[in-house]
């Protein structure tokens, strides 16, 4: 069984080793997608150097977004009170792993690399996930809803500003946008609580900072 989808009980040492392996794979490695990339439906376009750099910057931002999603979900999983919620988070995390792999592949095709700050992005998101989980399951789901809604909005913006000929990147983001919206809806239906107004604003501010940095570094 895939490591991140396993729900059987482990010893503390086993759990630590599994978590360490998963973090290393997410932050420094290349997680394997369980589904083929949507980009495969389109040929790799010939982009100008300027367009290639721009597309790479956008895809690096989206790659970081998926790194953050992994951190958030697994931080929440670590302290989830109910097995049903834990399974819900793990299922969403698997789709996010596919997104991460697709973005990584596209970055490679664009002759670029992931953000150098991925360890920071992951660790800060993991701590946010733990914090959200400790508040209780309804609040934890509320963080999922807000995160996915914000991601959905920035994906829509990226779809509008990608180089017109970059159909491969565009199709990846289109599929991701659909699935992020579904994650938000599922969390909402599972009993998410609406976050108080200062929290979404703070999350949006942190996301803007991440985008500025990740576009270049």
UniProtKB/Swiss-Prot annotation:
Binds 2 iron ions per subunit. The keyword Transferase does not apply. CDD domains: DMQH. Pathway: Cofactor biosynthesis; ubiquinone biosynthesis. InterPro entries: COQ7_proteobact (IPR047809), Ferritin-like (IPR012347), Ferritin-like_SF (IPR009078), Ubq_synth_Coq7 (IPR011566). It is found in: Cell membrane. SUPFAM superfamilies: Ferritin-like. It holds the Pfam family COQ7. Belongs to the COQ7 family. This is 3-demethoxyubiquinol 3-hydroxylase. It comes from Xylella fastidiosa (strain 9a5c).
């Amino acid at each position: 069984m895939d490591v991140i989808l396993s729900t059987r009980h482990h010893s503390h040492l086993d759990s630590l080793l599994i978590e360490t392996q998963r973090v290393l794979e997410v932050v420094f490695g290349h997680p394997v997608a369980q589904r083929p990339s949507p980009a495969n439906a389109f040929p790799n376009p010939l982009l100008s150097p300027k367009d290639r750099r721009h597309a790479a910057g956008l895809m690096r931002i989206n790659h970081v977004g998926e790194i953050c999603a992994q951190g958030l979900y697994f931080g929440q999983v670590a302290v989830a009170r109910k097995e049903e919620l834990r399974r819900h988070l793990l299922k969403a995390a698997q789709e996010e792993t596919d997104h991460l792999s697709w973005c990584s592949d596209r970055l490679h095709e664009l002759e670029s690399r992931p953000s150098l700050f991925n360890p920071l992005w992951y660790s800060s998101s993991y701590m946010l996930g733990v914090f959200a989980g400790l508040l209780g399951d309804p609040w934890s789901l509320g963080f999922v809803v807000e995160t996915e809604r914000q991601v959905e909005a920035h994906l829509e913006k990226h779809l509008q500003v990608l180089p017109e000929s970059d159909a491969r990147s565009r199709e990846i983001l289109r599929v991701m946008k659909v699935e992020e919206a579904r994650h938000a809806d599922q969390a909402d239906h599972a009993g998410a609580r609406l976050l108080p107004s200062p929290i979404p604003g703070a999350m949006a501010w942190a996301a803007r900072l991440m985008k500025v940095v990740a576009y270049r570094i």
